[in-house]
């Protein structure tokens, strides 16, 4: 319960979550099942949905019910929503671990390419060394 969170040399410890400039992607997509894909994206931004979905490979998904999405599609919607908020940094907490290995590798490569294109720094938390090596420019290993 002590310490500070600094981003771009600014202490953001006491900022409201939505004002910190940090995007989050979790192991399982955090989406609102009663909302459409577009409804979920509206939580981050009222516009830019078509472009965001195109960037993550989901063109035409705006009206789909999130409950009918596959795991990979759900992660892509979560990514689109996080990026619509234009975060200063994106935190990814085991985002590929619930996906099968082929889909995981494909999504990992797509996310890496998209983040590089947007010049958005990211921190990936993973237990998978190969995943870390494929995704990262630098790796920090934590233990105990």
Predicted regions and their residues:
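Conserved H-loop
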Residues: 119-125
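Conserved ABC ATPase signature
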Residues: 65-69, 73-75
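Conserved ABC ATPase "signature" region
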Residues: 48-61, 67, 112-116
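Hydrophobic anchor residue at the start of the ABC signature
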Residues: 79
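ABC ATPase NBD coupling module
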Residues: 4-27
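Conserved catalytic motifs of ABC-family nucleotide-binding domains
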Residues: 86
